[in-house]
Amino acid sequence: MTLTQDDILNVLNTARPVSIVRAGDGEKIVLESNNSIESYQLCIQSVMKRQMGYEPTMSEVEAIRQNLISAYQGADIIGIPMQKNLAELNKHWKGVADTVKPHATTNKTCSIDIFYDMLYDGSLLEWFKDKPVINYISCRKIPFERLLVKQVNHFQIAPEVKFTSYTGEHHYPDQFNRIERWMDKCAIEGH
């Protein structure tokens, strides 16, 4: 079942917690990293070094893979590639849904770009307007404060290395482990 922007807004309007987990070509490559030595090497070169900026140990790669599987198993909705030019993209983009499906416990999907689509058309910021608390995790700063939000808690993760010259703390395990502790400290009524 494919959900539209309006469907996602309706889900958000229920005011119940919802988990929307992204599944892109990098996630597909990580999920397949235990298929063969070639798959593992592709994961290291195309995802870990390129996106994260370093080569984690084999056990860390497997832990990341298992965390992805847990995320898909616990997701309410999974964001998958739905670009108009999907047929023209590489096999990793085209095969995302098939690779993630065995790990998912939901059949609800939406566009991998749903957050950006809603951010750019204004519907996401409108939905957040006047919320008492917003807790979000992102490598980008979103101007929620201008929406009259009383409290904004932002855990800023490292950006993808391929887009920046970032040399700070590693995504995994450093930031990953701190996020759970950070979330525990945030207001429970956050959105």
Predicted segments with their positions:
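Short, catalytically relevant binding-site loops at active-site mouths
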Residues: K141-P143, E160-F163
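Electropositive, gly/pro-rich neighborhoods at or near active sites that engage anionic ligands
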Residues: M1-H154
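Accessory, usually C-terminal, subdomains that scaffold auxiliary metal cofactors
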Residues: Q151, Q156, K162-H191
